[in-house]
Amino acid sequence: MTMRKRIAFLAGAISFDNQNRVLGGVLKRASELDMDVYVFTCFVNYDESEENKVGAFRIMDLQEFDLFDGVICMKNSIQYEPAVNSLIARIKKSKVPAVSVDEKVDGMYNVGISDYSSQKDIVEHLIETHDLKKINYVCGILQGKEGRERYNAYRDAMEEHGIPVCDNQIYHGNYNRESGRKAVEQFMKYNMPQAIVCANDAMAIGAMERLQQNGYRIPEDVIVTGFDNDELSEFFVPSLTTVDRRQELLGKNAVNLLFERSDDVNVQIDTKTIYRESCGCNMQPAMEIKDLRMEYQNKCLIYEEALDSLKCMELDLTGLENIDELCEKMKKYVVGSDMQSFYMCLCDKNEMFAYKSVCDHFTEKVSIALVYQNGKFCSDVDFLSKVI
């Protein structure tokens, strides 16, 4: 019997829509090829403390890449340099075929888009079609390729049209919705711009929320644009002008690159700029459609609140030194959720407590310290970490 091929997929936080859509493309193509995908991810924001990042990104140390037939890595999504450097070094050492999504990495295949030209198209649209001059920008993490290229595109488009940019027109965000809200609060301290261009959709939606809360109309008073074409961008009221990165196609092409062995090690996917209501284009006045979109928007916000609650749980559990206390606290969260089953894995208890300070690696043996199935908690189980 022929063994199914195995792909390791590595991403910083698939709770973000853009990462989740790439994964969706990987899963769909792998299913068509009768392959298995093993997902290694965590739930971490870009502004986490050093301690939380160290713990969260340890999952990236679990893989033995020699056991896989290929690796797909979303390098830019892992916003913690020590983890990224270690991960890339281990992938290269394994000699297993690997694809980097978005950012190019020496020795690996690459599939990505032109962040620069896509962002520049939006800024030029605002200048040339809407005749705007005061355009502020909410940038992402400038250490990453996406954030850097999108920011440079904004600055270049403004400069090429002879429009000066002041420091107070720039807000340095970290891709989450709260960054968009805080950006608007900063901009409100000065004269409000005609438009706010955001480096991703989450920040754009946060900006629109805060603008609406303060009585600003979009696009009549302030135009807002995003980037990524997240699911909510189409249904938010008003719908968001954005760039469709075609993430699912990125994922499918990543799988193809692994196993088709093309001579072209770099594949660039064409993006599509989608002009919607938030910039004054393609207005949709039908009230019944607006009501449906508002209903969907509210459901998405409830989902976001659930993710925030999960984050609070993680912070509540961080730093506990007693495993029994950890299990008891965890039980309250599990029972209060809709989960049908839950497994909490911990390093070997005896070895873990032999360390005077923080244990910086996974122990060889791992214990499932908490098991929840069919409404009941069960006894724990030990196994080797490498078989995860």
Language-model features and meaning:
Residues 1-49, 53-336, 340-343:
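Bacterial carbohydrate/catabolite-sensing allosteric modules
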Residues 345-388:
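GAF sensory domains
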